Amino acid sequence: LEEDIHEIDFNTRIAQAVESQNFREAIRLHYLKNLKILSDQNLIDWKINKTNHDYEVEIRDNSIKAPFSRITYLYDNICYGDFPIDSESYSRFVEDFEVFDKV
């Protein structure tokens, strides 16, 4: 993670990634967007050098921790585990990420 999540136009970048069928990048951006949402709500203390596990430990509310653990699992497997992702699987997985839009 090299970019400051507070300076990214997520909606535009996600739309561009989906339009170019770069679903792995779209998932990465959804994950970063969720980190920003959690940071903005003071549920995590975002720092560029923290790990996903660090954020999981910080989240105390189980109603947020459980879905965060799920998207972290998806993110890790899709972005680092080379889990194959096409438009159909993206459509299924994106619902898990969009839960945080309502936090």
What name fits each language-model region?
Residues 11-103:
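Membrane-proximal, non-transmembrane interaction modules
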Residues 1-15:
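Charged alpha-helical initiation segments
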